[in-house]
Design a protein with these regions (language model features):
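Short, basic, alpha-helical segments at the C-terminal edge of helix-turn-helix-like DNA-binding modules
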Residues: 70-77
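N-terminal intrinsically disordered/low-complexity leader segments
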Residues: 1-17, 157, 211-221
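N-terminal positioning helix adjacent to the helix-turn-helix/winged-helix DNA-binding module
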Residues: 11, 18-25, 167
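Hydrophobic/aromatic-rich alpha-helical bundle segments in the mid-to-C-terminal region
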Residues: 112, 128-141, 154-221
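Hydrophobic alpha-helical connector segments
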Residues: 67, 81-113, 167-171
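Helix-turn-helix
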Residues: 21, 25-63, 67
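Secondary-structure edge/capping motif, primarily at the C-terminal ends of alpha-helices
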Residues: 83, 87, 124, 182-185
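Amphipathic alpha-helical segments used for helix-helix packing
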Residues: 93-94, 108-133, 180
């Protein structure tokens, strides 16, 4: 059952400080309406803090954007690091478990599952080098997190090409593309469109690694 693959924890703890409240507001608003359409006033209103508090923590809206990408990276990184798929003894099962977890997380409207770093970089890849770099670190860091399992799966299957690094980037390409496709759809169809893309990715891995048509073995307790 896919829901069994989701870690029993929130992506992020409830914010307590003004800074974290602003970052949480940033996650919500950037997902809903994008970075450019989100003003400092809106961020403060959503966070329930003053404008003075904003500029106490962030020198500019761009500084908030950089911090937001880093905040997203650290919180989602911890979430995926705690996921049950890591307990599979076989590397290919860990890889497929990661893809299955990604599929399980795709539900509701796009703003409930889309990537903050992906949204930020789409809007700012030429206008803000600082935000672009922070988003690169976020997206590529996510790719590197599964690279060792991919390398082991390739070795186990005696597959010499492509490389683990290339496959890890391909996963991110499919994910980010799925998020964009979902945003182009009516809300009722968006998650299903994204799941379809990830299902094709899973089938590609099954073919590449010569996986038999059977369910992944349950994770050991």
């Amino acid at each position: 059952m896919l829901l069994d693959m989701i870690p029993n924890q929130l992506f992020r703890p409830a914010p307590v400080t003004a800074r974290d409240k602003l970052l949480e507001a940033g996650v919500k608003l950037v997902r809903e309406q994008g970075y450019a359409a989100t003003s400092v006033d809106e961020l403060c209103r959503e966070a329930g803090v003053t404008k003075g508090a904003f500029f106490h923590h962030f020198a500019s809206k761009e500084a908030l954007g950089v911090a937001l990408a880093n905040y997203w990276s650290s919180s989602t990184g911890a979430f995926f690091a705690a996921a049950p798929f890591h307990h599979h003894p076989r590397a290919i099962d860990r890889v497929l478990g990661y893809v299955d977890l990604r599929i399980a997380l795709l539900g509701g409207p796009p703003e409930s599952f889309s990537c903050v770093a992906g949204t930020l970089v789409q809007e700012n890849f030429r206008s803000s080098e600082a935000i672009r770099r922070a988003c690169e670190d976020s997206i590529m860091g996510n790719a590197r997190a599964i690279e060792a399992d991919l390398a082991q799966a390739l070795a186990d299957a005696k597959v010499t090409s492509p490389t683990a690094a290339s496959l890890s980037r391909h996963i991110q390409t499919v994910l980010q593309g799925a998020f964009i496709l979902a945003k182009s759809q009516e809300a009722a169809n968006s998650a299903e469109m994204a799941r379809e893309s990830l299902s094709h990715l899973r089938r590609y891995f099954e073919l590449l690694f010569n996986v038999e048509k059977k369910e992944i073995e349950p994770c050991p307790e």
